[in-house]
Swiss-Prot record:
Renumbered residue ranges of the record's region 27 X 10 AA A-T-P-K-P-W-T-A-W-K: 61-440
Location of the protein in the cell: Secreted
GO CC annotation terms, alphabetical: extracellular region
UniProt remark on domains: Almost exclusively composed of repeats of the decapeptides APPPAWTAWK and ATPKPWTAWK.
Intervals holding B- repeats: 61-70, 81-90, 101-110, 121-130, 131-140, 141-150, 151-160, 161-170, 171-180, 181-190, 191-200, 211-220, 221-230, 231-240, 241-250, 251-260, 271-280, 291-300, 311-320, 321-330, 331-340, 341-350, 371-380, 391-400, 411-420, 421-430, 431-440
Keyword Secreted part of the UniProt annotation: yes
Tissue: Produced by the byssal gland.
Protein name per its UniProtKB record: Foot protein 1 variant 1
Positions bearing 7'-hydroxytryptophan: 46, 49, 56, 59, 69, 76, 79, 89, 96, 99, 109, 116, 119, 129, 139, 149, 159, 169, 179, 189, 199, 206, 209, 219, 229, 239, 249, 259, 266, 269, 279, 286, 289, 299, 306, 309, 319, 329, 339, 349, 356, 359, 366, 369, 379, 386, 389, 399, 406, 409, 419, 429, 439
Taxonomy of the source species: Eukaryota, Metazoa, Spiralia, Lophotrochozoa, Mollusca
Location of 4-hydroxyproline modifications: 33, 65, 72-74, 85, 92-94, 105, 112-114, 125, 135, 145, 155, 165, 175, 185, 195, 202-204, 215, 225, 235, 245, 255, 262-264, 275, 282-284, 295, 302-304, 315, 325, 335, 345, 352-354, 375, 382-384, 395, 402-404, 415, 425, 435, 497, 500, 506
UniProt keyword Ribonucleoprotein, yes or no: no
Length: 561
């Protein structure tokens, strides 16, 4: 019961604070006059919850409505003392039968005239459940507390009325009319000029996806926007300088010199000869994948080429042959004992006759890593080599050649100057009025009262709230990780001493939810009575500090206890 009273007090205070701020919203209909005022009107016993002397106020008053539970001399220590504070529940003449007897041990909960006997007495606090009119007869009667759902004006008539807090969703101009209106913040995505036309430089804008020339025609055109990747000097010319850090691949010519050789540029991707025609060597091009001889026949050396995948003997027949190249994994000595031994088990990689040498054949292709010409010299064969990374023009000079568009990162105007230009597509996020100011205007929309806060229930933990908007970074505290208010899970990590956005400290009175609908919610879980006021105040002030909403007027934390 005490816990019920705690929760009801918090709920009443929250609702009271909301109603105090949001007059005259139709939500106030929940307060005056209420369909359940019958629960409070005199003479019902329930009014004893608020009547004078108020039973609830007795939570601090003397004597308490439940002093009967503790009546002196016994206090809670009476749990072992005699007589017990609850001996009234059992003491003769009334025992538990007092549920029917008069007076009841808990009559203090209701104060005369009506006591708990009202369960049978007339008039009962809940006789309304059967009496006429009932507090909920409104569910069928007219007007109903929710007739407003159909009646006019409704607490939420704003959902249909004009102006609605969200009438902008249908009204003109709407906060998002720009989604359809002209000009739209993003009409530039299709309009000319675009906010990001700077990304493309005139004349092409994003419309260039269909327009001619295309922003990426430069991928084929000359000069390319990225030709600067090829300009001189390049930021990575050092990759091309002499000596190179990796020139120590040491061999001359390099196995990849073919990747670098002038003169073809990246444009050669379509040009003739291709920078990689060396992969295929004339006359075959990529079609050589099926042609004979193959561009990579060098990898295998004649007679076997890549066709060796079907040819006999296969370069890998050794995988099936006997002895296997790796039988040494089981054999003695082991193939790797040679890491210290002489000769090495993998000298076979270079010397005939091991089966693995099939990868090399005669002359061994693998040995070509040192041999001349290399099996992959085709990858490199002059004129083009990898040296093109240093040569001029570079194979990718197209990526860099002036007038480089990419240089716009430093040029004026910048491609993203629109992000700073006026007007911005998102200036409305800072402009006044905001498209959504209706959601936060003062007086606050009626509907926001439905979302200001809620009471999450009693006795069991609430479900985790959806992640809300990020709040301000919280102060650092033990164990060190700082959580951001308003978020749960990965953002606000659980840790003592507990903070809004994290699970609350354990307590005896179940769970209390402070719910901030639409922006996430904080759970203040298992709050001990002595800590609830501070925890609620923190949650409240954190909410107001992190969100500049129209209901920030609810700055005063709800009173508790």
């Amino acid at each position: 019961m005490a816990r019920n009273m705690n929760i009801l007090t918090l709920f009443a205070v929250l609702i009271g604070s909301a109603s105090a701020v949001y007059h005259p919203p139709s939500w106030t209909a929940w307060i005056a006059p209420k369909p359940w005022t019958a629960w409070k009107v005199h003479p019902p016993a329930w009014t004893a919850w608020k009547a004078h002397p108020p039973a609830w106020t007795a939570w601090k008053a003397t004597p308490k409505p439940w002093t009967a539970w503790k009546a002196p001399p016994p206090a809670w220590t009476a749990w072992k003392a005699t007589p017990k504070p609850w001996t009234a529940w059992k003491a003769p003449p009334p025992t538990w039968t007092a549920w029917k007897a008069t007076p009841k041990p808990w009559t203090a909960w209701k104060a005369p005239p009506p006591a708990w006997t009202a369960w049978k007495a007339t008039l009962k606090p809940w006789t309304a459940w059967k009496a006429t009119p009932k507090p909920w007869t409104a569910w069928k009667a007219t007007p109903k507390p929710w007739t407003a759902w159909k009646a006019t004006p409704k607490p939420w008539t704003a959902w249909k009325a004009t102006p609605k807090p969200w009438t902008a969703w249908k009204a003109t101009p709407k906060p998002w009319t720009v989604w359809k209106a002209t000009p739209k913040p993003w009409t530039a995505w299709k309009a000319t000029p675009k906010p990001w036309t700077a990304w493309k430089a005139p004349p092409p804008a994003w419309s260039a996806w269909k327009a001619t020339p295309k922003p990426w025609t430069v991928w084929k055109a000359t000069p390319k926007p990225w030709t600067a990747w090829k300009a001189t000097p390049k930021p990575w010319t050092a990759w091309k300088a002499t000596p190179k850090p990796w020139t120590v691949w040491k061999a001359t010519p390099k196995p990849w010199t073919a990747w670098k050789a002038p003169p073809p540029a990246w444009t050669a991707w379509k040009a003739t000869p291709k920078p990689w025609t060396a992969w295929k060597a004339p006359p075959p091009t990529w079609t050589a994948w099926k042609a004979t001889p193959k561009p990579w026949t060098a990898w295998k050396a004649p007679p076997p080429a890549w066709s060796a995948w079907k040819a006999t003997p296969k370069p890998w027949t050794a995988w099936k042959a006997t002895p296997k190249p790796w039988t040494a994994w089981k054999a003695t000595p082991k193939p790797w004992t040679a890491w210290k031994a002489t000769p090495k088990p993998w000298t076979a990689w270079k010397v005939p006759p091991p089966a693995w040498t099939a990868w090399k054949a005669h002359p061994p292709a693998w040995t070509a890593w040192k041999a001349t010409p290399k099996p992959w010299t085709a990858w490199k064969a002059p004129p083009p080599a990898w040296t093109a990374w240093k040569a001029t023009p570079k194979p990718w000079t197209a990526w860099k050649a002036p007038p480089p568009a990419w240089t716009a990162w430093k040029a004026t105007p910048k491609p993203w100057t629109a992000w700073k230009a006026t007007p911005k597509p998102w200036t409305v996020w800072k402009a006044t009025p905001k498209p959504w100011t209706a959601w936060r205007a003062t007086p606050p929309p009626t509907w926001t009262a439905w979302h200001g806060h809620g009471y999450g229930g009693y006795g069991k933990p609430g479900k985790p709230g959806k992640p809300g908007s990020k709040g301000p970074r919280g102060p650092a505290g033990p164990p060190g990780a700082t959580g951001k208010t308003g978020r749960t899970g990965a953002t606000g990590k659980r840790g003592p001493p507990g903070y809004p956005g994290k699970p609350g400290v354990p307590g005896r009175n179940g769970y209390v939810h402070i719910v901030f609908d639409g922006y996430g919610k904080w759970e203040i879980g298992k709050i001990e009575r002595k800590n609830i006021r501070e925890a609620v105040a923190k949650a409240w002030t954190a909410w107001n500090a992190g969100h500049g909403h129209g209901w920030t007027a609810w700055t005063a934390p709800p009173a508790y206890g």
